[in-house]
From Swiss-Prot:
Pfam families: GATase_6, SIS. One of its GO terms (molecular function) is carbohydrate derivative binding. Residues 2-321 form the Glutamine amidotransferase type-2 domain. Residues 266-280 have a biased composition (Polar residues). PROSITE patterns: GATASE_TYPE_2, SIS. Pathway: Nucleotide-sugar biosynthesis; UDP-N-acetyl-alpha-D-glucosamine biosynthesis; alpha-D-glucosamine 6-phosphate from D-fructose 6-phosphate: step 1/1. Its EC number is 2.6.1.16. This is Putative glutamine--fructose-6-phosphate aminotransferase [isomerizing].
C-alpha cells in the first residue's frame, strides 16, 4: 500500500481533462513513497457511471493507458468526485488486476482505494464467494467494494434506501485491521466517503471565495441503537446484513437529490465558524467548493491552505459541497470537532529547484534544517535550551525513573546516537527499542517511565502501536516528529517538532540529523536542574550553535567523494562500516543508506568486534569505512585500523581535520581519509554521517539508480 489521493468539485466547472490532471498531479506528489502501480477512477459519460483506469509501472504508464481510450477530455463537470492510488505490492503480486482502484462488479457500482491491511479478508472473501461474487485479484482490498455492494443490495431488498455514510458504517463494522480508504459509487453520484483507522487521511478544503472556518463538528453514531444492526446469528449462517427496525428517518436517503437542485434544505452549516452564523451563500445558492483528500498533507500544498485531519474511527462524507464527519466511537466533549488547520507547507520546499533529485537537495538542506530545529530553542548567550512543547509536563519528565526511546529504521538509529548523552546527563536507565519488537514483547512499562517516540512522518504504524500500548500503561509520552498534524504529534502528551520541512526522497537524510539534534536538546532540557552537569551542558550548547556551518564544510568533500566512488568503490558490492561509542549509530545509519540507495551489501560492526571472524573476510578486500574521529575511544579505534592496514585492507577513514596519525599510510596509498570538522563527542555523529550520505548517493548515481525511488524500499509498509 502507498498513496491515496482524491478530488471533489462542487459548482466549480472542471473539464474531464482538468480532473484527470489533478488526480495525476496528486499521485505524482506521492511518488516519493515507493510504488509499482497506479490507478484512478472518474465519472463516465453518463451520470451514474464510473470508469477505472490503472496500470503497473510508473505514473507515466498510467497516463499512456488513459490516452488509449481517447476520452473526451473537454467534457465539463459542474460537480464530480474522483479517486486515485499508487500501490506497492503487498497482498497480491505485481499485476494489473491487483492495482487499485478495486470495484464491486463489472459495472463499477462501488469503487475503493485503500491503504492498510484487512486482517479478516480471507473470511470475508469466502463469505462473498459463497454469495456468488467473483474476485479478480489477490488483494485484501477487493473484499471492501464487494462488501459494499452486498450490503447495499440486501438493504434495498429489505426496503431500506441508505445514506452513503450509513452504508459505509455497516461495511466498516465488518472489517478488521487497519485502513485509510476512499469510496465512490454510481448509486451516489458526486459523493465520496473517506474512512480512517490506523492509516492517515487528510482533507484539504477550498472555497471559491475565502472562508472563515475553524472546525468541523463530529456527528457521533449511536452505539446502542444504530440505524441498522447486524445480527450475529444470521451473519454466521451466511447473511451479512440482517435488518432491524430503523429508528431514525434521518438515516434514509433524501429524495430528490439536492445535487440536482443546487439548493440546500438544511438549516445548519456543515462547517462551523468562529461565530454562530453561517457564511452567507452566494446569490442564494450553496457555496462552490473543492475538496482534496490524501494520505499525506504534502501532496495538498499546491492546492489548499486549510486541512482537516481525520482521527481513527472517523468517516468523512462529502456531498453537495458539504463535509460531514461521523465517528463510530463516542468521544469526550473535547473531541466533538475536528479542527481546520492551516497547512504550513511552502510549495517551493516540495520542488527540486536547481538539484538533480530530491535526495541531493535534502542532503544540502541540512545546513538550514539543523538551524530550523534549534531556532528559538537554543540560546548560546544564556546557555539554555527552551522547549515550549514540553513545558507543561516539566515536573513529570524530570521525575522520570527510566527513559525509553521507541522508533523504526533511521529514526531508531538517531535514538541510538542520542542514548549515551541521555544516560550521561540524566543519570537514569535509557532503553532504545525497535517499535515492532517492543510491541511483540509486551514490554514492562510503568507510570514513572518517559517514552519518546521518534518518526519523521508521525504515522509509522509500528511506532503508533507502541505509543498506544504505552498510553494504556499511563507512561508520559513525548513525540519527536516532522509533521505537526500527524498521529504521533496528536496522541502524545507533549513533543518537539523538528521543523525539517518535506522530505520527498525515500532515503532519510535531513530528518536524521534534525531528529538527532532534537533528542540532544531534550536531554539538555530535562537535565537543566542537575548542577553537576552545568559545564557539560554549556559545552554542548556552544557546539550546537556552530553545527550548521560545520555541515557546510563537510559538504565541501563532495568532489573527493565523487572521485572516490568512481575510482575505488563503484565496482564493489560489499562494504564494512566500523564504529564505536557515538559512532556505532553512524555506522548503522551509513550501512542502511548504502543498502537502500546503492543496492550493495553493507554491514555495520562495532570496532572491537573486528577480530571475531570479521578479519577473515578482509582478505577479499571489501571496502572498509571506519569512523575514527577524536573521542574517548580513539586509541582503540586506531589500533583496529592498524590491523586492517596490516592485512592490506586499505580502509577509508572518516577522521577530524588535522588528524595526522595515518599520514604516512595515506602517502603510501594504504588509506583514504575524509576529514570532517571536530565538535563535541555527542554531536560528532551529525557531521560523520554526511560523508556516508554522499557516498551512498554517488554510488547510486554511478550505477544509474533512481535515488528518489529505489526498488523495494518504502516509507509506508504499510505506513512507515
Amino acid at each position: 500500500m502507498c498513496g491515496i489521493f482524491g478530488y471533489c468539485n462542487f459548482l466549480i466547472e472542471k473539464t474531464r481533462g482538468e480532473i484527470i490532471d489533478t488526480l495525476i498531479e496528486g499521485l505524482q506528489a506521492l511518488e516519493y513513497k515507493e510504488y509499482d502501480s497506479s490507478g484512478i477512477s472518474i465519472q463516465g459519460d453518463e451520470l451514474k457511471s464510473l470508469n477505472i483506469y490503472k496500470q503497473t509501472g510508473k505514473i507515466s504508464s498510467l497516463k499512456e493507458e488513459i490516452d488509449l481510450y481517447n476520452l473526451n477530455k473537454n467534457l465539463p463537470f459542474i460537480s464530480h468526485c474522483g479517486i486515485a492510488h499508487t500501490r506497492r505490492a503487498t497482498h497480491g503480486g505485481l499485476r494489473r488486476a491487483n492495482c487499485h482502484p478495486h470495484n464491486s462488479d463489472p459495472s463499477n457500482e462501488f469503487v475503493v482505494v485503500h491503504n492498510g491491511v484487512i486482517t479478516n479478508f480471507a473470511n470475508l472473501k469466502a463469505l462473498l464467494v459463497a454469495k456468488g461474487y467473483v474476485f479478480k485479484s489477490d488483494t485484501d482490498t477487493e473484499c471492501i467494494p464487494k462488501l459494499y455492494k452486498h450490503i447495499y443490495d440486501t438493504s434495498i431488498e429489505l426496503g431500506y434506501n441508505l445514506d452513503f455514510h450509513v452504508l459505509t458504517n455497516l461495511v466498516l463494522k465488518e472489517l478488521e485491521g487497519s485502513y485509510g480508504l476512499l469510496c465512490t459509487s454510481s448509486h451516489f453520484p458526486d459523493e465520496v466517503v473517506a474512512a480512517r483507522k490506523g492509516s492517515p487521511l487528510v482533507i484539504g478544503v477550498k472555497g471559491k471565495t475565502d472562508m472563515d472556518v475553524n472546525f468541523v463538528e463530529v456527528e457521533y453514531l449511536d452505539q446502542e441503537e444504530d440505524y441498522l444492526k447486524l445480527n450475529t446469528q444470521t451473519k454466521s449462517s451466511g447473511n451479512v446484513l440482517a435488518a432491524a427496525p430503523v429508528k431514525y428517518n434521518t438515516c434514509l436517503r433524501k429524495s430528490p437529490p439536492l445535487r440536482s437542485q443546487y439548493l440546500r434544505n438544511s438549516t445548519t452549516s456543515t462547517f462551523n465558524h468562529g461565530s454562530s452564523t453561517e457564511t452567507p451563500a452566494e446569490n442564494g445558492l450553496p457555496r462552490p467548493m473543492e475538496f482534496y483528500l490524501s494520505s499525506d498533507c504534502a501532496s495538498l500544498a499546491r492546492y489548499v491552505s486549510k486541512v482537516v485531519y481525520l482521527e481513527d474511527n472517523d468517516t468523512a462524507h462529502i456531498y453537495d459541497g458539504e463535509l460531514h464527519i461521523h465517528c463510530s466511537k463516542i468521544g469526550s466533549e473535547d473531541f466533538s470537532f475536528r479542527t481546520v488547520q492551516k497547512l504550513e507547507l511552502e510549495l517551493s520546499k516540495i520542488k527540486k529547484g536547481p538539484y538533480d533529485n530530491f535526495m541531493q537537495k535534502e542532503i544540502y538542506e541540512q545546513c538550514e534544517t539543523t538551524k530550523n530545529v534549534m531556532r528559538g530553542r537554543v540560546d548560546a548567550f544564556t546557555n539554555r535550551v527552551v522547549l515550549g512543547g514540553l513545558e507543561n509536563w516539566l515536573t513529570e519528565l524530570r521525575r522520570a525513573k527510566r527513559i525509553i526511546m521507541i522508533a523504526s529504521k533511521s529514526s531508531f538509529h538517531s535514538c541510538l546516537a542520542a542514548r549515551p548523552i541521555f544516560e550521561e546527563l540524566m543519570e537514569v536507565p535509557v532503553n532504545v527499542e525497535l517499535a515492532l519488537d517492543f510491541v511483540d514483547r509486551n514490554c514492562c512499562i510503568f507510570r514513572n517511565d518517559v517514552c519518546i517516540f521518534v518518526s519523521r512522518s508521525g504515522e509509522t504504524t509500528d511506532t503508533i502501536n507502541a505509543l498506544n500500548y504505552c498510553i494504556k500503561k499511563e507512561a508520559v509520552t513525548i513525540g519527536v516528529v516532522n509533521c505537526s498534524g500527524s498521529s504521533i504529534s496528536r496522541f502524545t502528551h507533549c513533543g518537539v517538532h523538528t521543523n525539517t520541512g518535506p522530505e520527498k526522497g525515500i532515503a532519510t537524510t535531513k530528518s536524521y540529523t534534525s531528529q538527532y539534534i532534537a533528542l540532544v536538546m531534550i536531554a539538555l532540557w530535562m537535565s537543566e536542574d542537575l548542577v553537576s552537569k552545568i559545564e557539560r551542558r554549556k559545552e554542548i550548547i556552544q557546539a550546537l550553535t556552530i553545527v550548521p556551518s560545520q555541515i557546510k564544510e563537510v559538504l565541501e568533500l563532495e568532489p573527493l567523494i565523487i572521485e572516490l566512488c568512481d575510482k575505488k568503490l563503484k565496482q564493489h558490492d560489499t562494504f564494512l562500516l566500523l564504529g564505536r561509542g557515538y559512532q556505532f549509530a553512524s555506522a548503522l545509519e551509513g550501512a542502511s543508506k548504502m543498502k537502500e540507495i546503492s543496492y550493495v551489501h553493507s554491514e555495520s560492526i562495532l570496532t572491537d568486534e573486528l577480530g571475531h571472524r570479521v578479519l577473515a573476510v578482509t582478505s577479499d578486500n571489501p571496502p572498509i569505512i571506519a569512523f575514527a574521529t577524536k573521542d574517548a575511544f580513539s586509541p582503540k579505534i586506531a589500533s583496529c585500523i592498524d590491523q586492517i592496514i596490516e592485512r592490506k585492507g586499505n580502509p577509508i577513514i572518516i577522521c577530524n581535520k588535522g588528524h595526522k596519525i595515518w599520514e604516512q599510510d595515506k602517502q603510501k596509498g594504504n588509506v583514504v581519509t575524509l576529514e570532517v570538522p571536530q565538535t563535541v563527542d555527542c554531536l560528532q555523529g551529525i557531521l560523520n554521517v554526511i560523508p556516508l550520505q554522499l557516498i551512498s548517493y554517488w554510488l547510486a548515481i554511478k550505477k544509474d539508480i533512481g535515488v528518489d525511488l529505489p526498488r523495494d524500499s518504502a516509507m509506508s509498509a504499510p505506513d512507515i
